[in-house]
């Protein structure tokens, strides 16, 4: 089950879900919503984090070192519950890492950290990917 977290400054309030570390709301101090709020008829999502691949893979997968892997559309981060590893009033850090489930689609050892920070009326987003293995790791973020 996902949780909803809030960070804020004097000028901005941001809500982020632990499911996919997805930003769900960005409001100014008057309560004006800046983010699309989703509509199942068109597109129910808001602000997806796409990792380790952006878009659809040709034939739904790829071959690496002679083995074929099938990858979900836009990768698996959007469907993963992230851990919160740090939270302050204006900043939150989400984290996910490889697991037996992710390795069925992406055969690499990794850590993936997303930092959201509200500074005055701006939202800063920082992505950090750590390759924990010995081989070159290919990935994309969107």
Locations of the language-model features?
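Surface-exposed acidic/polar loop and edge beta-strand patches at domain peripheries
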Residues: 1-142
């Amino acid at each position: 089950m996902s949780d909803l977290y809030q960070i804020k400054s004097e000028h901005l309030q941001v809500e982020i879900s632990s499911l996919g570390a997805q930003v769900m709301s960005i409001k100014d101090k008057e309560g004006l919503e800046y983010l699309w709020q989703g509509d199942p008829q068109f597109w129910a999502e808001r602000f997806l984090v796409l990792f380790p691949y952006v878009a659809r893979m040709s034939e739904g997968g790829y071959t690496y070192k002679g083995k074929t892997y099938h990858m979900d559309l836009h990768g698996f981060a959007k469907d993963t519950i992230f851990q919160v590893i740090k939270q302050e009033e204006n900043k939150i850090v989400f984290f996910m890492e490889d697991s037996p489930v992710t390795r069925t689609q992406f055969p690499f050892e990794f850590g993936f950290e997303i930092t959201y920070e509200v500074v005055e009326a701006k939202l800063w987003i920082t992505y950090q990917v750590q390759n924990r293995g010995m081989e070159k790791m290919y990935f994309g973020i969107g």
